[in-house]
């Protein structure tokens, strides 16, 4: 069974950021007004309704629309101008705000720094010990400035404290218990609200 591989060449991602300008026939750095004018002219020329029998015109129209959509969006245009279509692909995958971070971390010096730090720390083993295990399960951790106190309360002391608290709070006994609520009971009575216990 043979695989059906299309003869169409897979489009490569550029890093120069000039192809969309070339589609519209503009120079890199063209103003928004120039982009709009050229887009209108080319869109009318290659519109599928004006060229119903020409599939190449339809494809050209799609390319023109895509170029216009990217070049009129300020953030996409700045990413495209700086990083090309590869930058747009990264923005689609990781978000517009993470494009600079992605290219910074994929640079040769960031990779070299990662390898050097990894070698110096024994494949990050000592970082693991310090951060995760607090250096040998806490045996090597620094002494804290606040001394730890043992809080042991004997049952007799706790019982005396509870009795003294109960004696202080026995000023006003409860005379009336709340009524049971059901589905027909209103949560708030009509009329004035009173938060006092005296009636």
From Swiss-Prot:
| SUPFAM superfamilies for this protein | Chaperone J-domain
Task: Extract the InterPro entries matched here.
Answer: DnaJ_C_subfamily_member5, DnaJ_domain, DnaJ_domain_CS, J_dom_sf
Post-translational events: Palmitoylated. Palmitoylation is not required for membrane association.
Q: Which PANTHER family match?
A: DNAJ HOMOLOG SUBFAMILY C MEMBER 5 HOMOLOG (PTHR44027), DNAJ HOMOLOG SUBFAMILY C MEMBER 5B (PTHR44027:SF6)
Gene expressing this chain: DNAJC5B
| Tissue/organ expression | Testis specific.
Q: What name does UniProt use for this protein?
A: DnaJ homolog subfamily C member 5B
**Record-listed Phosphoserine modification sites:** 14
Its subcellular locations are: Membrane
């Amino acid at each position: 069974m043979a695989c059906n591989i299309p003869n169409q060449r897979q489009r490569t991602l550029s890093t120069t950021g000039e192809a969309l300008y070339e589609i519209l026939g503009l120079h890199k750095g063209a103003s928004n007004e120039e982009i709009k004018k050229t887009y209108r002219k080319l869109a009318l020329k290659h519109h599928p309704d004006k060229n119903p029998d020409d599939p190449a015109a339809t494809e050209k129209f799609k390319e023109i629309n895509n170029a216009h959509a990217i070049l009129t969006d300020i953030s996409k245009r700045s990413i495209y101008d700086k990083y090309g279509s590869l930058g747009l692909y990264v923005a689609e995958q990781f978000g517009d705000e993470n494009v600079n971070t992605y290219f910074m971390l994929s640079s040769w010096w960031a990779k070299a720094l990662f390898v050097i730090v990894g070698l110096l720390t024994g494949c990050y083993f000592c970082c693991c010990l310090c951060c995760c295990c607090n250096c040998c399960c806490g045996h090597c951790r620094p002494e804290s400035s606040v001394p730890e106190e043992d809080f042991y309360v004997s049952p007799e002391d706790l019982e005396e404290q509870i009795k003294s608290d109960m004696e202080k709070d026995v000023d006003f006994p409860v005379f009336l218990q709340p009524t049971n609520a059901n589905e027909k009971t209103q949560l708030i009575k009509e009329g004035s609200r009173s938060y006092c216990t005296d009636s």
